[in-house]
UniProtKB/Swiss-Prot annotation:
Species of origin: Streptococcus suis (strain P1/7)
Record's signal peptide: 1-32
Pfam families membership: Mac-1
Record gene name: ide
An annotated GO cellular component: extracellular region
Protein's name in the database: IgM protease
Transmembrane segments: 1119-1136
Amino acid sequence: MNIQERFSLRKSAVGLVSVSLLCAIYTSTVAADTVVTGVNEIIEESQVKDEVSIESEKNESLDGSNIEIVEEIADNIPSPVIAEGEVAVEMKVDRGTENVVSRNDTEVTTSEQNQIEVTETKEILNQTSYQTESGEQRQIIWAHGITPPAMEQSGGFVKEKYGDYLNYTAPFEAGKGYYDTNKSLNASFIDLNLCFAAVSSNMVHWWLEQNSSYVERYLKEKKGTVNVEENYAITDLRRYINSFQNQQNSRVFDMFKTYYGYRTNGFVSDALVDLFINGYKPKAQGGVNLEDSQLVPDSRGGFFYDVFKEKKLTNRIFSGSYERFGEDVRTVLESKGLLGLTYRTLGYATHIVTVWGAEYDNQGKIKAVYITDSDDQQEQIGLKRMGITRDASGNPRLNNHMKNNSAGALLDYVHTIRLGQDLWEEYFNPLAKAKETASQTLADTKKALDLSIQGQSELPESMRLIYLEKLNNLYNQGILSIQKAESSEMLSGALENGLNSLKSLDFPISEVGNALAPDLPVGDRSTVSDVDSLSSQETSSTNLEADTENAGIIADGTNQLHFPVEAQTTSSVEAEGDNVFEQEADTLPIIIENKDEFGSELSRNMQTSETDSLVVAVEEDVKNDEVAQVEELLESEKVENQSSELLSDTLIVESANDKEEDRVEAVVSEQPDSIPHQNVEISLVEPTNVETETVVTPINDAATPHGSPTYIDNSVTESVATPLEKDSIQAGETEIAEPTSSESTNVETETVVTPVNDVATPHGSPTYIDNSVTESVATPLEKDSIQAGETEIAEPTSSESTNVETETVVTPVNDVATPHGSPTYIDNSVTESVATPLEKDSIQAGETEIAEPTSSESTSVEAELVDNSEIHAATSSVTPCGSSAYADGSTTESVATPLEKDSIQTGNTEIAEPTSSKSTNVEAASVDNSEIHADASLTAVSSVNLDNPVIEPVAISLIGSKRDTNAEVEVSSLSKREVRKTNTDGLISVQSKVIKKELLESSLAEAGSPLLEATIAQSSNSNSTEIGMSYQNTVLLESNNTERQVSKAEIVMEHKETELVETVSSASEPVVLVENISQTSNNTIESGKNMGVQSQAGAKQILGVEQSSKVSTPTSRQIMGVGLLTLVLGSALGLLKKRRK
């Protein structure tokens, strides 16, 4: 396909050449020549050569019925036009050239009714109006600086009709303000696809001409004189000033051809304009340039970078709907802009033309655009009128079809450019822009006061006119002062004086003042009766001072004034008729961080519904005495609840604090009735002072029936209940230092409860919901056993004052439905428990029940650290009436038993449970340099000092079941901690009680070894297993005041190969292996490598341990040790014999 055919197909898309015509001559070559036969009479000639047969061309060539070319009407009445294209068709036959022209004389008339009447031309918007043949009034908005073409008789537009297509064209006229850069006459390949560059060239030429005064001034400052005839370099701006000579000669277009010639595809016009003005380098894919303050101008352009910097003058928008497109085009033209319009031709190919004007009907709908096209170089055409129609889908189309609105070409993008004269002014006269801004500020203030004066209905009309006249005089004086300012300092002073003079106008605004209502307690309100001036407002009920000198006054068009009021102690302003603050106190969630002092700042902007009222926006400070009721439970009620909870299987962890004033918090938890060994006994030998502080926050959006106190905790809770002497506890990102006390116990319990949403709790069921990070430290003990995490916690009492027998079972619960009277605790948090500073004792944690090894003169330490263990709550759980549930869907960490000068570091190790008669056996699972990865919301306890590191989490899991094919023992580590022994003289013996339902086989190891009896108890209610050691099994050594080191011990427990204990189960055989590596200078025990036996899927692991401690003397301890050992050996042998029988 040659160039002419390609151009013809492109023009057919917009109706300049009939599609039926092209189909008829699908193999023909159309060469268009224009022959001027008379004034305002253009006859289009075309040569049509049939490549198939000359005879068919003689007999079947197109005649007048196929195409009708009509001479331009004398009065040149424009009508809907569609596109650019071939203007004439010349037919050649064997007898010569025959012009097939059918002239409709009925359309060629010069009557006045068909003459275009130019009714008005607006200089500012450059508009012209005319009347169509049918009598419709049309308006044309031209681009800024355009001299509209002649629309009267003898005008330049030619009317051409091709079947149902109607075209109007006009020849190019230089000096009319518009530009028509065309491609090469021979359609050279260098600019074959540079229609985008031609449009960019037109825009640049127009922009340079309209900004000629600024450009000349700029060139004089930068380059000196400009000689247009001189051949400047391609990168010299002076080369392109007044460089458009004709449609085929444009230096700007030549530059773009140099940079973008020989392209096989198109590009975007706005990118090239940005290159020329700012120096933006066009993006490879033609993306829109984003303003970049760090812009470095491209060396090929950026001719006006000093003026505009990174501020672009171009834009690219999608054509959108028909209505939107018409509004966008109008907006651009009326704002002194120019457009490039892209439309689709065949397939996805597009073409772009320059828009110089737009035509609208009397309803404001766009009907046509006036364009120049770079592809009409073969014709003497400048402007073309192309119709705009709305197709069936509501999209705009470039369409010259007179009947079918859905014909023609779909529009694509619109590229725009503006003059940027405001930026020119800022560059040459920075003070001018500042004056404009100052004048606008003064005008806005004047308008606000004007509306305020007119809105005073009680003010007599005569007085109103007097105030308005005074206001106008003050405003004019201020504007005059601003215009006379010769520097920025003078301008600032003039603006300030002008604003002050306007504000000094004193007129009564009592009615407006009625809208000012200070914030009072709910149910009481008052109004402001006396307001003396705009600069000072005083209220009768509240000291409300509004400094209007610093307040921006803004009018909103409905006779309302907005005064941003600044006040130190203000309240929300309430409009008359609006009940803004009538809210229930219990529906406002308030978090109290300090029980003595708290405050909340609420900012509200209120607007009155009346049009003549004043609206004041203030900031509200709520005082302490204005806060809604927050504390619902009294201290006595809390103590009562604690007592009742102790009687109903609730564990309350208490701690002693003798000298140091540390903040103590307790975590209260309960366990279901279905789990055995739930009795909790806390006995205090000496008087215990209990201080309970409870901060209860009302629940928001919670359905809580009558009498059911609900406590929700979504916060970060750290409970410290065990002052440890010379020991520090570090958990996650929290470090706790605890002093110890051996005498009276002072317990301060503080429970912080924060709100939760959408909790339904039946009548009388206290519910505790905790989604927080919890750290608990409990019961200062010197020699004891600790079980924390999701375990039963046994915490003995101190040596001289407290005997504690505790047990805690943590049951995972999610989606809890709590019946009547069932206190429920839900915890989706990271829990850290720190308990019972022990000297050389057993530490147990994490879904485990630990039995202490039996020894007469030895110290055993059994430790297990659970590494990153996650306890996932069950999907659904129902707690029976009267039971208590504690749901924990989080990571549990237990910290227990700081041992003196010992560091227990555990890794992925399994359980070792030794017994020894004369040696010190230490069992620990440890890994060096392990770190706690606590929850991100975990925060440090500010009231606790850090002295010495202690064990973080300690836990041992030993699980076995006769119904399980596998049992799993997992020992892992969360952190490395050092354990230091406290200087104590007392002795604590720990007795572990385990209720057993089924007794499995047990075997003895060697003759000299004490018996370790392992039992597995199957719970009938919870399908959980409990594994315990002996009924009474542990006697600890007496601790000395001097520090001593724990001797090395290496214990290996292995299935069927252990030297100490072999535990045999009917259905499962847990294998436990502990490697004791070595003891460092500070008695660090490291062990690793564990082997676990997995428990049956779905089985819950709930272990219970009851421990009690008694105070004994060294002599009684030895006697008790012998007795206990004898009792254990005897009972074990008896049971074994009975079992074998």
